[in-house]
Regions:
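Short Cys/His-rich "knuckle" micro-motifs
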Residues: 32-38, 66-71
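Short cysteine-rich loop/turn motifs with clustered Cys
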Residues: 6-34, 58
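Short, surface-exposed acidic
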Residues: 80-90
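Short beta-strand-alpha-helix junction that forms the catalytic/metal-binding core
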Residues: 21-22, 44-67
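Short Cys/His-rich Zn2+-coordinating modules
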Residues: 1-12, 38-44
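Short edge-strand/loop segments of extracellular domains
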Residues: 40, 79-80
């Protein structure tokens, strides 16, 4: 439950931060975008809440093209730089305790609120 709530808050922040711009196809997507992880949460749970690893993405790219990684990586390098992309390749921690998850959830609720009030 806590992890799902934290993920929901994080994803909402990512979508608000990036708007309707799909990082993979490099175009505005009318309608709903998703928070697409460059490294999936299954493959790299340590990057689940890493803002450099997650960006707005079309449903087609995120769900039907496995993230469209061939297009995602060059766009990610352009957006955050090669050094930060390479930092994502270093494996880190993969588990959080409940207090940390609640703190993550609360942090992204505040970030989303602040983003929406600008």
């Amino acid at each position: 439950m806590w992890l799902r709530e934290a993920q929901t808050a994080f994803n909402a922040y990512i979508r608000a931060r990036d708007g309707n711009w799909c990082i993979s196809s490099q175009r505005i997507i009318p309608g709903q975008t998703q928070a697409g992880h460059f490294y999936t949460t299954a493959a790299r749970p340590d990057l689940r809440f890493n803002e450099d690893n997650c960006h707005s993405q079309s449903v087609t790219d995120n769900q039907h093209k496995s993230g469209n990684i061939n297009e995602y990586r060059p766009a990610l390098i352009e957006k955050i730089g090669l050094e930060r992309v390479e930092e994502l390749e270093v494996v880190g921690r993969s588990d959080w305790n409940i207090d940390e998850i609640i703190a993550i959830r609360d942090e992204y609720k505040v970030k989303l609120k602040n983003l929406n009030t600008k």
